[in-house]
Amino acid sequence: MPVSAPSPPRLHSPFIHCPINFTPSSFSARNLRSPSTSYPRIKAELDPNTVVAISVGVASVALGIGIPVFYETQIDNAAKRENTQPCFPCNGTGAQKCRLCVGSGNVTVELGGGEKEVSNCINCDGAGSLTCTTCQGSGVQPRYLDRREFKDDD
C-alpha cells in the first residue's frame, strides 16, 4: 500500500482573524465593495511580555524626563537660598596655613657645621598663609556646582 505524503500544515497567525464575509444585507450605498469580496481582518493580541515591554518603555521615558527636571528644580531652589556655611578647610577665615613654612613665613635651612640660613618662604612670600583654594578667600563654603577647579599649591 503506497504511503501518501502528509499535506503541509495550514499557516496560522494570531494577527489574522476570520475573513469578513459580506452579505447582501450588509451591503449599503456607502460601501462600494462587491458583496462577494472578503478581506482578512487584522486583530492584535497583547501577550504579557509585550505589556511588560511597553510598560518598561513608558517608565523609562518618564524617568528620563523626570530625573533631570527634579535636579533642575533642586538647583534652582539651592541658588535661591542664602549660603552661610563656613568653608571647611580654612574654617571660614579665607586663608590656609602655608604647608612649606608651616605658617611661620620663614624657611630654615641647615647648611652643616652648625650653620643655619633663615630666608623668606618662597611659597607664601613670607606671609605664612595662602588664599584658601576651596572658597577662594571668601570664607564661605561654595555649593557643589559653584566650586572652582582645584588648584594644588604644592
Curated annotation (Swiss-Prot):
Q: State where Zn(2+) 1 binds.
A: 87, 90, 132, 135
- Keywords noted in UniProt: Chloroplast, Isomerase, Membrane, Metal-binding, Plastid, Repeat, Thylakoid, Transit peptide, Transmembrane, Transmembrane helix, Zinc, Zinc-finger
Q: How is the cofactor bound?
A: Binds 2 Zn(2+) ions per monomer.
* First and last residues of the transit peptide: 1-43
What is the membrane topology noted in the UniProt record heading this document? Single-pass membrane protein
InterPro entries reported in the protein's UniProt record: DUF5351, HSP_DnaJ_Cys-rich_dom_sf
Q: State what induces this protein.
A: Not induced by high-light treatment.
Q: Which GO terms describe its cellular component?
A: chloroplast; chloroplast stroma; chloroplast thylakoid; chloroplast thylakoid membrane; mitochondrion
Transmembrane residue ranges: 51-71
The record's subcellular locations are: Plastid, Chloroplast thylakoid membrane
Instruction: Name the positions where Zn(2+) 2 binds.
Output: 98, 101, 121, 124
Which residues belong to zinc fingers classed as CR-type?
Answer: 77-147
Q: What class of enzyme is it?
A: isomerase
| Cofactor(s) required for function per UniProt | Zn(2+)
Q: Does the keyword Nucleus apply?
A: no
In the UniProt record, the signal sequence range is none
Q: Which GO terms describe its molecular function?
A: protein disulfide isomerase activity; zinc ion binding
Gene Ontology biological process terms from the UniProt entry: photosystem II repair
What EC number(s) has UniProt assigned to this enzyme?
5.3.4.1
Principal location: plastid
Query: What is the annotated quaternary arrangement, including any partners?
Result: Interacts with the photosystem II core subunits. Interacts with HHL1.
Q: Belongs to which family?
A: Belongs to the BSD2 chaperone family.
This protein is called Protein disulfide-isomerase LQY1, chloroplastic
Which organism does this record belong to?
Arabidopsis thaliana (Mouse-ear cress)
